[in-house]
A protein has these predicted regions:
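Conserved segment of the helicase C-terminal RecA-like domain
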Residues: 216-238
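Residues immediately C-terminal
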Residues: 7-10, 38, 129, 190, ...
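Short secondary-structure boundary/capping segments
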Residues: 44-51, 137-140, 197-198, 216
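Walker B catalytic acidic pair
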Residues: 3-5, 203
Length: 238
């Protein structure tokens, strides 16, 4: 089982396709998971496994093109089959360009947006920017209402912080704070099932922006502050 398969870079993709072909040859089941896999990558991964299964060549169905979301694509010796699935009702979300020039301005905006409570996440593209933004947020909100998360923490500290994220902002959290800001880097995009009322993010490729937005109003909650009941993602632009 390989999760977040879209995150593979070009180097990893070459090895992944080779591994899929080998696994297909031995008939080993493989599950690939992604919420933002482009059609071309889906096609390449399906074709790699299909080559191993020995089902490519004349008469094989094409695997290119757009399909609905969510969907399950399966490969067997008989070929490729796509099953579109009825998903849950989509939560309307707005992406709003926002011009903020400094970490201090970000902290002041959050102080205003969370005046009636709520949990927000700020996603910066570098560790340095995350650290600077966290210091500004902490100076406004205090240490108890601010958390920093990035990849440079030691492994034990990173595990502890990930666990804290799930305890405070996970689906089944019973400790969700009244008001809190998490400042993070891209590490929060994947694998953490957390839910925030408001999001601020640096610009990023669209597939990564969609991954980030997946942490915004992720779960049904009837207790969100009134001003945060509309899911908003503020993109920090110069």
């Amino acid at each position: 089982v390989i999760d977040e398969v879209h995150a593979a870079d070009e180097y990893m993709e070459t090895y992944l396709e080779a591994v899929l072909t080998w696994l297909g040859m031995y008939g080993i089941p493989v599950v690939l998971l992604s919420a933002t896999l482009p059609p071309a990558r889906r096609s390449a991964l399906l074709e790699a496994y299909r080559r191993g299964r020995g089902s490519s060549g004349a008469g094989a169905e094409p695997v290119d093109g757009m399909i609905g979301y969510p969907a399950i694509s399966t490969v067997s010796s008989a070929g490729v089959c796509v099953h579109e699935i009825q998903g849950e009702a989509e939560v309307p979300k707005r992406i709003i360009p926002t011009s903020l020039g400094s970490p201090r301005e970000i902290a002041e905006l959050l102080d205003h947006e969370l005046a009636e409570g709520g949990c927000a996440v700020v996603i910066r593209n570098t560790v340095r920017e995350a650290q600077e933004t966290y210091e500004a947020v902490r100076s406004v909100f205090g240490r108890e209402q601010a958390t920093l998360l990035h990849s440079r923490f030691l492994a034990a500290e990173r595990v502890a912080r990930d666990r804290c994220m799930l305890e405070l902002f996970g689906k089944d959290s019973v400790q969700r704070p009244f008001r809190h800001v998490v400042v993070a880097t891209q590490v929060i995009e994947q694998s953490l099932d957390v839910d925030f009322d408001l999001m601020l993010t640096d610009p990023a490729p669209m597939d990564l922006v969609l991954q980030r937005i997946g942490r915004l109003h992720r779960h049904d909650r009837g207790d969100r502050p009134v001003r945060l009941r509309e899911a908003r993602c503020l993109v920090l632009v110069e």
